[in-house]
Amino acid sequence: MRRSAAARPAAVLAAAAVTAGLVTGVAPAAAAAPAACAVPADHEIADVQGTGDASPLAGRTVRVEGVVTADFQRSDQLRGFFVQDPTPDDDPRTSDGIFVYSTREVNVRDRVVVTGKVVEYHGLTELSPVSAVDVCGTARAIAPDNVRLPLEDGAGLERFEGVLLRFRGQMVASETYDLGRYGEITVAAGGRLYQPTDGHDDSSQAENEARRLLVDDASNVQNPDTIPYTADGRVVRLGDVTAGLTGVLSYGFGSYRLQPTRSPHFARANPRPDKPRPVGGDVRVASFNTLNWFTTLGRRGADTAAERDRQLAKLVAALRGLDADVVGLMEVENNGDTALKALVDALNAASAETGSGRTYAWTAHPYPGTDEIKVAFVYDTATVTPVGGPRSSRDDVFDRPPLVQAFRPAAGGTAFTAIVNHFKSKGCGGASGPDADQGDGQSCYNARRVKQAAAIAELAAAAENPLVLGDLNSYAAEDPIEVLEDAGLTSQTKRFVDDEDRYSYVYMGLSGELDHMLAGPALARRVTGATIWHVNSDEPRFLDYNTEYNPAEFYRPDAFRSSDHDPLLVGLDLR
């Protein structure tokens, strides 16, 4: 959890004492009856929590009584503990648990009376500073409340803040972006979460929010030496499942978060795919966003030569795994052909070493634009032959102009025209007017992407057997994709990939397809298959090439987390 002790007032930190240990489970019930506390409480915990998001007693000093349910007092933890009333009130709107920011030594099942000031800390109701913690006996362990997501009647989690919970049913790993940095993982009830604008059923924003839960590690350490859920070197992937999640519900940095009292175990439900699913055909075409392949250090890609070598090794492994005849690339450094040549040279060296028989060349971009990154084609000179020269567009709607190149099987056959693209991103920097976020789920610059799609549709209409591919920064049910489909182009991933597997990117825990392969009518009849190779979006980012913060033992020169986008692959029957 991102909770910094340094952000605490000095007086509060001065009041903290020695730390206690991490709870590894809920203690068994004890038969001994607790003695009466000498100092009575003057408020119930439910009164402190109130019926809303914030405490009605904020700023006041109160004295509450309860039983310790979780102890996270170490300096690398939350520097406090959770207390819960063993006799809850009858109001379902109020919580009967609360966080106590104090390192006064306590243990789970201690019956305590705590005196402290009620504050809202990043949205969490807690007692801080604490002037007294009186331990007055040992109580029966508080049994966790059983809950299931989504909650009934659209109820929120506020009523469970500070309460010991057990989540019933299976939960699916849906986001690991901050697993390596903060020890956080997002899970969801009922399966993977999808972008509402990607055309999946039951994926509205409200439904997604009701099904998701952030699981924290009860720690304030950033970039911990030991990353959760990496036992025996096996790293959790999105789609893996857990059950019986148990812990105390906290809140911070805009999210409810479960602080586990029992370490979750994730079962492998989404095995790593060593190679793409077969797509058939005599020519295979791939689309791959390289996530800023730069030979220039310290720009968008690698910061050091060592990182650049690590990135290159992973990119080569991914390209060799795709085993494609033509590959459309995105986010290649726009520094002439320097970065592109370095990638192709490394790919050919690896191919020669293994005797794969492939020798790749690249297509020069006639007008790559002025952006720091560009699109590119690499192709196997033994299996396909370029037909005519490369073309592009000087339409100022493009920040990164497309690249158009026709290819024919080297042994003879039908030609097709590949059009590789990288549309304007969804980031909102500088967006105004129609490019501003319209609140329709398509984020910023959708109007620009619609214009880009229309321009590409015109290029495709004039091309022989067009295949539009690349990172279109648009999910499958958004306006730009509709423009292309209305122009007669057909999504081959929608056609061949099962709905639950149709995603290439994960953002804020939501899976969706930003990368696309769309074929013209005649070429679509020659498509033998399509797949999305999930080697990147399901993997945590601490597996990538970066050396800062990423534990060295997890790096492998393989395809997994070679980028943040999954590559796409289609098969064509052209002979």
List PLM regions with ranges.
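Secretory targeting and sorting signals
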Residues: 1-33
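Short amphipathic alpha-helical segments, especially helix-boundary/capping motifs
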Residues: 21-22, 41, 143-145, 430-435
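Extended non-catalytic accessory segments flanking core domains
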Residues: 33-298, 302, 306-318, 349-351, ...
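Divalent cation-coordinating acidic motifs and surrounding scaffolds
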Residues: 105, 184-185, 189-192, 214, ...
